[in-house]
Amino acid sequence: MVSKEVEKLLLKVQKPGRYVGGELNEVIKDKRKVDVRFAFCFPDTYEVGMSHLGMKILYSLFNSVDYIWCERVFAPWIDMEELMRERQIPLYALESGDPVSDFDFIGFTLQYELSYTNMLNMLKMSNVPIYSRDRTELKNIVVAGGPCACNPEPIADFVDMFFIGEGEEVDLEVMELFRECRAEGRCKLEFLERCAQIEGVYVPSLYEVSYNDDGTIAAFTPKGNAPAVIHKRLMKKMDESFYPDNFVVPLVEIVHDRAVQEIFRGCIRGCRFCQAGFIYRPVREKSPEVINEQCKKLCMNTGYDEVSLSSLSSSDYSQIVPLLEKLTSWCGEEKVSISLPSLRVDGFTDEIMNKIKTVRKSGLTFAPEAGSQRMRDVINKNVQHDELMQTCATAFAGGWTTVKLYFMIGLPTETMDDVADIAHLGQSVVDTYYQTPNRSKGKSVRVTVSASSFVPKPFTPFQWEPQDTIPVLREKQAHIKESITTKKITFNYHDADTSFLEAVFARGDRKLAKAMALACERDFHFDGWSDCFDLQKWLDIFEECGIDPAFYANRRRSFDEILPWDHIDYGVSKQFLIKECRKAYNNTTTPHCRLQCSGCGAAKYGEGVCFEKRQNLV
């Protein structure tokens, strides 16, 4: 539902369907009959936000509670934003059309550090003060979660509370407490102090941060009864976890326009650069029976003809073949294709391939991450060259002719020879295609090589490592391009400038807040979009604020330095991460969790693969 003022703008903007709501399966409630109104804000465009599984789950979860009405808010694209500012139209929610400032909670899911300026811009467009200290009443409570909550410090001055870990349970606990506090006439501070006692809730205003003369952190000091360490929340029984039986079906084409079914959380592998592989430990699976039934309901209620099996590594699902047997038993008849978007090189077997082929072939994507075997050992990828070639040969024999390969440059200990091996590996895949006798005849192979830049992230063994400087990253990108000698390989790479700013925010502290506030004042937004990003403008702001961004991005930390996220516990011990970092420099790999428990600390949750492994050893 949109106002007449908004309607007048729709013919003047790209994709007006982004801004009107009214989609199939949206939830409409009588706002006079609910106690809590939650504006679920995704700090990017409609197409990106509507593709996000976490938003789909929490939107349905909140709205399954009678007294909560959760509505969606997305960042308007530049053309719409300009018109809204000109006509002084505040940011609004799609379902009711009401201004965001009318809501009790303004919640953000933070998937990417470069969305921080969008978060602040959305508050600004809502006429809501960006600083937490300036929002004094028990309304417009700004909350945030998602992987960027691993290090909440750069935006700690703006957010009232962060949800640490998985949100299905803690979110509702906070909503219920809010309802109670408002009925009792409590103030905002009293509400926040009580929220801080809930496991998985971090209230930044209840902590003092002091610094050493060299700019590093001296101490985090909790105020009052705030806990010294905030422990993450997680769902232990995935079969019992909430999952929607329908999704809001978008009016415009979105990035991932299909049904998405989560099959497990966590990852058994432990790639040393991968934040998700550590913060979502331990691995917890859904049963094939539950997954199959949920897929049926989703496809029936949304009309989608593709279902994507979502996880960090779908082929590591322990019952992948029985699951595919169940799915293909009805997907073929219903003309529903099955997508496995996160396949490991060593997980694409003949059996899996044949199951997928019976429905409809979708694209294949693999992530070797490094071109040389030495570098794959450094990052603990545990994938051999011959395995990759055999996997590609299997795919080519099965009728596939396009393969996407994801790599990362700038990793610790990397040399130019390692970088050139990325191009060489792509060439080996091309050669394998023409060496496969039973490939599709009369077709050419297309290999896409994509190289992102290493960004050191919290709660990984590489969290202490420096990022390569921008000139070095550009040199490595050019070296790959020069090393590719065939037009059958397409080379894509991430902009080094944006990766640099991502690294600044990923390992930043509260001193960055003044730079972000100044960026908001100057209308920065969509930093993750290359046509909107201007590094020089950021460097100017950092200089004005007396901040050296290289201090955060390009500096190696010592193991005994207090890190901005050290007061948060994601279940993996710092001692384990240090041990893994040292093993990387010795080119030593660590077995995955099903082969051996490496003692990361996640077994303490009493659930998941690592706990099962330890139980079997007793």
Each PLM stretch: what is its role?
Residues 41, 45, 296-404, 408-448, ...:
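Conserved SAM/AdoMet-binding glycine-rich loop
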Residues 52, 253-289, 596-617:
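Canonical Radical SAM [4Fe-4S] cluster-binding loop centered on the CxxxCxxC motif
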Residues 76-222, 461-509, 517-531:
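Glycine-rich beta-alpha loop elements in corrinoid/cobalamin-binding modules
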Residues 2-28, 32, 38-40, 485-618:
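Radical SAM enzyme core and accessory elements
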Residues 9-39, 46-47, 204, 210, ...:
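N-terminal [4Fe-4S]-dependent radical SAM core
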Residues 38-44, 62, 249-275, 299, ...:
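N-terminal pre-triad scaffold of radical SAM enzymes
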Residues 195-205, 312-317, 341-347, 410, ...:
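A glycine-rich phosphate-binding loop feature that marks nucleotide/adenosyl-phosphate handling sites
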Residues 67-79:
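A short beta-strand-loop structural module common to alpha/beta enzyme folds
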